[in-house]
């Protein structure tokens, strides 16, 4: 599945064989240097000092008239943060995230978006063997609260400052010259996250794993693992257990 409307808006023009090659992880766009991102995170109240992209790689950035976007593959194979995982994804969750993220976009909710969903032709071992897939997604950024936590928990404060400077330049350049721009960054991130969760609640969306490793600095919805929509209002409903 190739999201041609999104590709057009990003100025991406590829032949069919290039789509299959690049977005399956079998080939790389010119000048691409893939990286897996490192981060920590509070998961359901417990701090985990080392997480990172276990099955995702960032291919690079796309500059458009509307700003800069990350281009990321999910399910393309092992990274240095895979731990005991295989770095792969089953095709079902890939298609599910494709549909959900596009639905959220058209519902007016800030979100990562799906550019392509590719069947790999391989099988991945889960409870049973399932068809494998790779998702290509874009987002304004994959910087997470957990990215800051990784360095802060190690007292690497110069790295925290560098990360904050990058986040300001990328997402909030209008605050660069303010006297307390780091405090203003915190306020902007908190405000955008509050607005995001409010939009979720307005449409009955439950993320299911809203931990700091899934909390973007840009205020976008990412990682559609156990998420669901409420069919009927039930304030105690959960989808993460």
Name what the model sees in each region:
Residues 123, 129, 202-207, 211-241:
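Catalytic activation segment of kinase domains across protein kinase-like and atypical kinase folds
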Residues 187, 195, 239-241:
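Internal nucleotide-binding/catalytic subdomain
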Residues 159, 181-192, 202, 206-207:
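Short, contiguous, pocket-lining structural segments
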């Amino acid at each position: 599945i190739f999201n041609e409307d999104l590709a057009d808006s990003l100025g991406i023009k590829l032949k069919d064989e290039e789509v299959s090659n690049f977005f399956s992880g079998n080939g790389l766009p010119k000048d691409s240097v893939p990286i897996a991102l490192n981060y920590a995170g509070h998961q359901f109240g417990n701090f985990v000092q080392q997480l990172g992209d276990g099955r995702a790689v960032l291919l690079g950035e796309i500059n458009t008239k509307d700003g800069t976007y990350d281009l990321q593959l999910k399910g393309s194979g092992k990274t240095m943060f895979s731990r005991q995982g295989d770095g792969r994804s089953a095709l079902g969750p890939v298609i599910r995230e494709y549909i959900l993220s596009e639905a959220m976009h058209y519902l007016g909710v800030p979100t990562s978006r799906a550019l392509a969903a590719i069947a790999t032709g391989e099988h991945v071992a889960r409870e049973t063997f399932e068809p494998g897939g790779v998702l290509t997604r874009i987002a304004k950024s994959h910087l997470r609260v957990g990215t800051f936590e990784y360095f802060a928990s190690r007292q690497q404060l110069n790295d925290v400052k560098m990360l904050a400077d990058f986040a300001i330049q990328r997402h909030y350049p209008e605050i660069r010259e303010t006297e307390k721009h780091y405090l203003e960054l915190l306020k902007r991130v908190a405000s955008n996250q509050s607005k995001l969760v409010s939009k979720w609640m307005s449409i009955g969306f439950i993320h299911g794993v809203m931990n700091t490793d899934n909390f973007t600095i840009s205020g976008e919805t990412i990682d559609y693992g156990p998420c669901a929509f409420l069919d009927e209002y039930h304030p105690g409903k959960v989808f993460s257990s």
